[in-house]
Swiss-Prot record:
Pfam families for this protein: DHBP_synthase (PF00926), GTP_cyclohydro2 (PF00925)
Swiss-Prot/TrEMBL cofactor(s): Mg(2+); Mn(2+); Zn(2+)
Residues reported in the UniProt entry to bind GTP: R255, V256, H257, S258, S259, Q276, E298, G299, R300, T320, T355, K360
Co-factor binding details: Binds 2 divalent metal cations per subunit. Magnesium or manganese.
Summary of the function given for this chain in its UniProt record: Catalyzes the conversion of D-ribulose 5-phosphate to formate and 3,4-dihydroxy-2-butanone 4-phosphate. Catalyzes the conversion of GTP to 2,5-diamino-6-ribosylamino-4(3H)-pyrimidinone 5'-phosphate (DARP), formate and pyrophosphate.
Enzyme Commission numbers on file: 4.1.99.12, 3.5.4.25
Protein name: Riboflavin biosynthesis protein RibBA
Binding site for Mg(2+) 1: E31
UniProt keyword annotation of Manganese present: yes
Involved pathway(s): Cofactor biosynthesis; riboflavin biosynthesis; 2-hydroxy-3-oxobutyl phosphate from D-ribulose 5-phosphate: step 1/1; Cofactor biosynthesis; riboflavin biosynthesis; 5-amino-6-(D-ribitylamino)uracil from GTP: step 1/4
Site annotation Essential for DHBP synthase activity: residues: H129, E167
Keywords, comma-separated and alphabetical: GTP-binding, Hydrolase, Lyase, Magnesium, Manganese, Metal-binding, Multifunctional enzyme, Nucleotide-binding, Riboflavin biosynthesis, Zinc
Amino acid sequence: MEEIKMDRIEDAIADFKEGKFVIVVDDEDRENEGDLIIAAEKITPEKVNFMLKHARGVLCAPITVSRCKELDLPHQVSDNTSVLGTPFTVTIDKLEGCSTGVSASDRAATIQALADPASTPATFGRPGHINPLYAQEKGVLRRAGHTEATIDMARLAGLYPAGALMEIMSDDGTMARLPELRAMADEHGLKLISIHDLIAYRLKQESIVEKGVEVNMPTEHGMFRLIPFRQKSNGLEHMAIFKGTWNEDEPILVRVHSSCATGDILGSHRCDCGEQLHKAMEMIEKEGKGVVVYLNQEGRGIGLMEKMKAYKLQEDGMDTVDANLCLGHLADERDYGVGAQILRELGVHKMKLLTNNPVKRVGLEAYGLEIVENVPVETVPNPYNERYLRTKKERMGHTLHFNK
């Protein structure tokens, strides 16, 4: 099959700055779809009409979390159970100068108002015909989605961080795939880029971690090396524990492990985190080379205080997923972008990933890392964590096995 040509990110940024559309595609393991994106301040009724005619999907308007708060745009639902956690807010229409809100001119006016610093909550009526979307603050380095790609493109182009996007559908109503997207881009003189390439571009342009000093680290599993890393955006400190040497094209064992004070330090039986960490280190010691990236992301990213609240809800009958959702969190709020950059700093590009979690694989692959094999880290359930592990298997898709 002929490889589909993608355009340079630099050329796409230049077009975006001029108010042209760009087509953005994501990973095959994610939505495997293309979106038509444009800067909010560059939208016109004619461009809205082009999107409705040629893309045919749902017209959405990505904006930043801070902008959502400024405009008092809450999440559309308190319990987001969509597959990819698409972060819709309540729908809106611009009030002044618009009629029903559904025409191309009304929709363009609403999107333009999102990029107008003078707009306030009173500028918009709710509900309406435009779907704003919360974009993660660190863009595609936090979440490899079209929403974040739109905001990143606006920022890279020096424009207001707001945009419009629409999924591209084929004439028969199915989602357009890469060959058709390339043909559409060529027909209309548009640039076609991938989120994968946008991530790689940002990682080359930006460093999100500061590397510390490397030291020896003797452990019960053998002699390792340790390097701390500080995340520049929030000061969080992470570490890489590794041994051996490798070539850039050599797949090595990698465990990306989120901190669990209760499991890793106290040996808690409520989870299997500590067991997975030690098993991973044993496997790396046996292999003679490999990396554990230890991320400071307690409680799947919600922190120790919130994790204890979730534990209390679990004691009252909820499972681990519903407890997070009840507290206003996603089921999993971890950021794999920082882990990906740490691995790149260590010269790791191909890996045999030590995980039971399919989301972790997708999260790392989105940042340009190649996973040649998933290596499960099986643990033995105990009476305190069996329900937790079953929830991870049944509701989060983890690869786990239980004795009948």
